From Swiss-Prot:
UniProt keyword annotation of Transcription present: no
Gene3D superfamilies according to UniProt: 2.40.50.100
Biological source species: Gemmatimonas aurantiaca (strain DSM 14586 / JCM 11422 / NBRC 100505 / T-27)
Similarity field: Belongs to the bacterial ribosomal protein bL27 family.
A single MF term (Gene Ontology): structural constituent of ribosome
Protein name: Large ribosomal subunit protein bL27
Positions of the UniProt region annotated as Disordered: 1-21
PANTHER family, sorted: LARGE RIBOSOMAL SUBUNIT PROTEIN BL27M (PTHR15893:SF0), RIBOSOMAL PROTEIN L27 (PTHR15893)
HAMAP family: Ribosomal_bL27
Keyword annotations from UniProtKB, A to Z: Ribonucleoprotein, Ribosomal protein
GO biological process: translation
A GO cellular component annotation in the UniProt record: cytosolic large ribosomal subunit
Length: 97
């Protein structure tokens, strides 16, 4: 028989801080240079034209424009930003027609 009560240790009692990953700006939304488009773990989304990628795989805009998502392959996606000049020209063409 034990002289002292055995002290157990809890395997719970820890919780990690939230990382707030995910898409921050969706397709068709206007972004300015430096805006974060999405935060991710690894490269599910790859940077396209006018888009940069940080050391933690954060994808951000390099120019002012509109966000555009596209399929790179069956599993991978590509994120582009269409600059403002091109967006304005397309709007003017629609208004004239």
């Amino acid at each position: 028989m034990a002289h002292k009560k055995g002290v157990g240790s809890s395997r719970n009692g820890r919780d990690s801080n939230p990382k707030y990953r995910g898409i921050k700006k969706y397709g068709g939304e206007f972004v300015t240079a430096g805006n974060i488009i999405l935060r991710q773990c690894g490269t599910k989304w790859h940077p396209g034209s006018n888009v940069g990628m940080g050391t933690d795989y954060t994808i951000y805009s390099l120019v002012d424009g509109v966000v555009q998502f596209a399929h790179k392959s069956k599993k991978a996606y590509k994120v582009n930003v269409v600059p403002v000049e091109y967006v304005e020209v397309e709007i003017e063409e629609v208004v004239e027609a």
